[in-house]
Amino acid sequence: MLKNFKNFTLEDMKAKRLELKKEYLDLRFKSVVGHVENPLKKREIRRDIARLNTMICEYELGIRKV
């Protein structure tokens, strides 16, 4: 599933990153305690968080324009 974060504003990206971090933490707990129906979802979420971190850093450094 391809995510398109390029159209997000900086505030939207930070909010989405926080949401994904919470979802990732929940999936980690579920995988330790019990069964997760889609174990690859953790990898997808982790990579989306990394993409958002990269884009936020680019905005802060001035590489990417708002």
From Swiss-Prot:
Keywords tagged on the record: Ribonucleoprotein, Ribosomal protein
Domain of life the protein comes from: Bacteria
A GO biological-process term: translation
GO-annotated molecular function: structural constituent of ribosome
CDD domains: Ribosomal_L29_HIP (cd00427)
Pfam family, one: Ribosomal_L29
Coiled coil stretches, renumbered: none
Keyword presence, Ribosomal protein: yes
Entry-linked Gene3D superfamilies: 1.10.287.310
GO cellular component: ribonucleoprotein complex; ribosome
NCBIfam families according to UniProt: L29
Family in the record: Belongs to the universal ribosomal protein uL29 family.
Stated name of the protein: Large ribosomal subunit protein uL29
Organism of origin: Borreliella burgdorferi (strain ZS7) (Borrelia burgdorferi)
